[in-house]
């Protein structure tokens, strides 16, 4: 006869299920606490910044990838893994043009897919294709087929080419469907402020990459003359311009976010992009008006900042024209 503890009907199997359920419940509880805690964004920025400072972006992507898998599998909120997921892509700028260095990270793809399937098995949602779905589908097709009559097959399958064609095409469509379906659920937090926090953290991650490039050049040469050439400056400019308004929105409740806006603006200027200066100045001016209308700063303070910015532009004009 079987021992009672090995009885699959009510013994061993029931205990195993209870143990697994208890373990997953704790894992899920810790994931939700981390996602909703104040430590969420600082921890992610610390991980990304530490690995970028050490010059080990591949290991940083692995670390962030493990966090993504944990949050995806254990947290019911699909927004939780978004920030570390995109931070991993921002860290790849340190090997821009040499994305083959990240091929070992492909080992994270199977557990990532399994975590995604597990997430929708445990917390199922009804997929919804919103009004932008058809437009994004057409953009995805255009992205995949664009340049097919010009570039060679070898160029098309290069890691950097696949990164853009798949990421900006099919990847954006998949993300849109997932989040369009998921964001209809009720939440215990302000969704707008949480989105702003995610963009703010991504902007700070990109700013850290730019500032670390200058710090390493200064440590290597003892001084930094002019603006460094950054191979990823257009990419960095796009990320920073997108994220720049977010700290000003968050500063309505916490003035400390204005420092974050200043760091992003500094990194934007150091990218060496003329479009960064032009559009960055426009965004900062609009953000200043936004802060004034909400009583964060006075009209006199805004005028003083505008005059100081104008003097700085005139002083830096000759240098800017040389870029």
Label each residue range with its predicted role.
Residues 67, 171-174, 190-221, 230-294, ...:
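Alpha-helical transmembrane segments of multi-pass inner-membrane proteins
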Residues 105-112, 133-146, 156-180, 238-239:
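Aromatic-anchored transmembrane helix interface
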Residues 37, 46, 138-141, 168-172, ...:
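Hydrophobic alpha-helical membrane-embedded or membrane-associated segments
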Residues 113-116, 140-147, 211, 288-291, ...:
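Hydrophobic membrane-targeting signal helices
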Residues 1-148, 184-193, 250-255, 297-305:
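Transmembrane signal-anchor hairpin modules in multi-pass inner-membrane enzymes, especially those
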Residues 93-97, 147-156, 214-220:
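Juxtamembrane "helix-exit" motif on the non-cytosolic side of transmembrane helices
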Residues 53, 207, 308-322:
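Transmembrane signal-anchor helices characteristic of membrane glycosylation enzymes that use polyprenol
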Residues 54-59, 98-107, 164-165, 226-242, ...:
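Membrane-interface micro-motifs in multi-pass membrane enzymes
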């Amino acid at each position: 006869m079987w021992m009672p503890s090995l009885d699959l009907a009510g013994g061993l199997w029931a205990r195993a299920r209870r143990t697994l359920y208890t373990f997953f419940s704790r894992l899920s509880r810790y994931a939700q606490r981390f996602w909703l805690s104040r430590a969420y964004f600082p921890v992610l920025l610390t991980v990304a910044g530490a690995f970028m400072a050490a010059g080990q972006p591949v290991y940083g992507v692995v670390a962030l990838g493990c966090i993504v898998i944990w949050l995806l599998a254990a947290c019911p909120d699909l927004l939780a893994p978004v920030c570390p997921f995109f931070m991993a892509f921002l860290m790849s700028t340190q090997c821009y043009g040499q994305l083959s260095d990240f091929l070992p990270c492909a080992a994270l793809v199977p557990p990532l897919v399994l975590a995604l399937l597990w997430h929708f098995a445990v917390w199922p949602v009804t997929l919804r294709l919103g009004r932008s779905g058809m437009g994004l589908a057409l953009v995805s097709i255009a992205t995949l087929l664009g340049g097919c009559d010009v570039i060679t097959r070898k160029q098309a399958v290069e890691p950097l080419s696949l990164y853009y064609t798949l990421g900006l095409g099919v990847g954006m469509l998949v993300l849109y469907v997932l989040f369009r379906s998921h964001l209809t659920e009720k939440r215990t937090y302000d969704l707008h402020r949480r989105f702003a926090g995610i963009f703010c953290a991504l902007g700070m991650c990109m700013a850290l990459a730019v500032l670390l490039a200058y710090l390493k050049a200064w440590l290597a040469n003892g001084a930094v003359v002019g603006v460094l050439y950054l191979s990823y400056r257009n990419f960095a400019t796009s990320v920073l311009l997108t994220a720049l308004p977010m700290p000003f929105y968050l500063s309505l409740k916490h003035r400390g976010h204005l420092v974050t806006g200043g760091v992003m603006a500094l990194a934007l200027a150091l990218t060496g992009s003329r479009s960064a200066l032009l559009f960055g100045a426009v965004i900062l001016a609009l953000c200043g008006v936004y802060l004034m209308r909400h009583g964060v700063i006075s009209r006199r303070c805004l005028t003083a900042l505008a005059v100081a910015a104008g003097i700085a532009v005139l002083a830096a004009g000759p240098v800017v024209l040389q870029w």
